[in-house]
Amino acid sequence: MAENGGRAGKSSGSGTGKGAVSAEQVIAGFNRLRQEQRGLASKAAELEMELNEHSLVIDTLKEVDETRKCYRMVGGVLVERTVKEVLPALENNKEQIQKIIETLTQQLQAKGKELNEFREKHNIRLMGEDEKPAAKENSEGAGAKASSAGVLVS
């Protein structure tokens, strides 16, 4: 995908007008948006797992004596602390992770809207996608959409 994006970027400066966008450029832009969306979803899933781990550790440490020794990884170094020192830091980290997940979820929704708008603007259909919804859209807005050729993305 990165190779296609590189070639599409080079061909855009070679002499085509700004109004005309080739099918390769549309596909490269669409794939770039999909990749960004996947990256956001992946990061959100990773943080969800980390949040679950924090919750598990916090629940476990709440049942333990506050003076008991525990170990915490700080900057790649294992540090010996007490439960009383570690628990507030873990709870703070958990809150921060929750805020980041909320932000990522909002970004993911915005990216999804942007991707759908891009699909509609360039009449992009994915391989394996049903033709029935597309046929219904064409019958309703035949004047605007009949003139533009669709782009098929695998």
From Swiss-Prot:
GO cellular component, one term: cytoplasm
Protein name: Prefoldin subunit 2
Primary location: nucleus
GO molecular function: protein folding chaperone; unfolded protein binding
Biased composition (Basic and acidic residues): 124-139
Gene3D superfamilies: 1.10.287.370
Leader sequence residues: none
Renumbered residue ranges of the record's region Disordered: 1-20, 124-154
Alphabetic keyword roster: Chaperone, Cytoplasm, Mitochondrion, Nucleus
Subunit structure: Heterohexamer of two PFD-alpha type and four PFD-beta type subunits. Component of the PAQosome complex which is responsible for the biogenesis of several protein complexes and which consists of R2TP complex members RUVBL1, RUVBL2, RPAP3 and PIH1D1, URI complex members PFDN2, PFDN6, PDRG1, UXT and URI1 as well as ASDURF, POLR2E and DNAAF10/WDR92. Interacts with URI1; the interaction is phosphorylation-dependent and occurs in a growth-dependent manner.
UniProt similarity note: Belongs to the prefoldin subunit beta family.
Function: Binds specifically to cytosolic chaperonin (c-CPN) and transfers target proteins to it. Binds to nascent polypeptide chain and promotes folding in an environment in which there are many competing pathways for nonnative proteins.
Subcellular location(s) per record: Nucleus; Cytoplasm; Mitochondrion
Keyword Mitochondrion assigned: yes
BP GO terms, sorted: protein folding
Keyword DNA damage belongs to the record: no
Annotated Gly residues bias: 1-18
